[in-house]
Amino acid sequence: MSERKAVIKNADMPEDMQQDAVDCATQALEKFNIEKDIAAYIKKEFDKKYNPTWHCIVGRNFGSYVTHETKHFIYFYLGQVAVLLFKSG
């Protein structure tokens, strides 16, 4: 599988957690092909590791406007796929 370059577009999150998000998304993309399944994997992993409630959107073309808890937001690309991950609630 080709190496996907991670490009962080926007983040309000500690750097170690950002790296976790990229690593988790990389694992998800290796395991799943359907964007919904990729998002579910990332969300569930972050719920386990950093406590609920995380939300994750994965896709190639979407807009967003969300409210998130301080220091719990990241938006990045992994290759052609965008990942929006944030904690709210």
Curated annotation (Swiss-Prot):
* CDD domains linked: DLC-like_DYNLL1_DYNLL2
Source species, domain of life? Eukaryota
InterPro entries linked to this entry? DLC_sf, Dynein_light_1/2_CS, Dynein_light_chain_typ-1/2
Q: Which terms does the UniProt entry file under GO BP?
A: intraciliary retrograde transport; motile cilium assembly
Q: Does the keyword Lipid biosynthesis apply?
A: no
Q: One Pfam family this chain carries?
A: Dynein_light
Does the keyword field hold Cell cycle?
no
Key words of the record: Cell projection, Cilium, Cytoplasm, Cytoskeleton, Dynein, Flagellum, Microtubule, Motor protein
What Gene Ontology molecular-function terms does this entry list?
A: dynein intermediate chain binding
Entry's localization field? Cytoplasm, Cytoskeleton, Flagellum axoneme
Q: Which GO terms describe its cellular component?
A: cytoplasm; cytoplasmic dynein complex; microtubule; motile cilium
Subunit text: Consists of at least 3 heavy chains (alpha, beta and gamma), 2 intermediate chains and 8 light chains.
Instruction: Tell me the protein family, please.
Output: Belongs to the dynein light chain family.
- Give the protein's recorded name: Dynein light chain LC6, flagellar outer arm
